[in-house]
Amino acid sequence: MISENVKLINSKIIEPVFIDDNVVIENSTIGPHVSIYKDTKILDSHVENSIIGKHTQVLNAQINNSMIGNNCKYDGNYKSINIGDFSELI
């Protein structure tokens, strides 16, 4: 399910996915098996088999089998990672 007010710019979505309200995805590939919660930005990334919390930024990432919490900022190339709420990994 993809919410109506998701902004997709030059990106590919591979179902099944859940993408919540006010998400921006740019120059990225998302899916399969990805959940992205509200007010999150994903730029220049590839995300699969992962959960990304609300109010989070994912930049320049290649992630798989990962969980990123709420209010996080992630800029990196770890392939599998779990990050708690209010974390920064840049």
Could you tell me what each predicted segment is?
Residues M1-I90:
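Left-handed beta-helix
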